[in-house]
Amino acid sequence: MDSRPLAVIDVDGVVADVRHRLHLIEDRPKRWEEFFARAADDPLADGVDLVRELAADHDVVWLTGRPERNRALTERWLAEHVLPDRPLLMRPDRDFRPARLTKREQLRRLRDDRAVGLVVDDDPDVVATLTEDGFPVRLADWLPHSSILRAAQERHGRT
């Protein structure tokens, strides 16, 4: 096992400010492809600062509910904001399970190989599930968690 623990960080709502595009998934029909295509988000200073601080003594792993087909766009965004761009774990394109389940599954696999020092996520349901599973978790509370984003994560399995 490597000596440095992992810092596992969500993207949307932690380092990327998605508020400007939430209207695309608020009403029906939900415009998911446009929502993801417009992911030229402003960075969230609190999240970016935390990631840079954690990178001093942790290996950063990104764990996002964004679908795999948005990998290049997400990696480009991370690079533009001078954040580590790999490893980046993403939701399989056709996996619409709640974020709390997909993230728990991915984290259990990571935990088999490395110590997980901290997980940072903005979704209270994800935080509760991971805490119950014994992961050290910090709720990213620098933005109020949106009910639109919560529905996307829980009911639609999209972010």
How would you label these PLM feature ranges?
Residues 2-97:
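Alpha-helical substrate-recognition element adjacent to the catalytic core
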Residues 98-111:
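Short loop-to-alpha-helix "cap/lid" segments that border enzyme active sites
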Residues 2, 57, 110-116:
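Glycine-rich phosphate-binding loop signature in dinucleotide/nucleotide-binding domains
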Residues 77, 102-103, 152-156:
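Short low-complexity, flexible loop/linker segments enriched in glycine and/or proline
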Residues 93-99, 143-148:
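A short acidic, often aromatic-flanked loop/helix-cap motif at beta-alpha or helix-coil junctions
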Residues 27-28, 79-83, 107, 138-139, ...:
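Short, low-complexity, polar/charged sequence segments that are solvent-exposed and flexible
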Residues 35-41, 144-159:
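A short, conserved beta-to-alpha structural element at the edge of catalytic cores
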Residues 107, 113-154:
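Acidic, Mg2+-coordinating phosphoryl-transfer loop and its flanking beta/alpha structural elements
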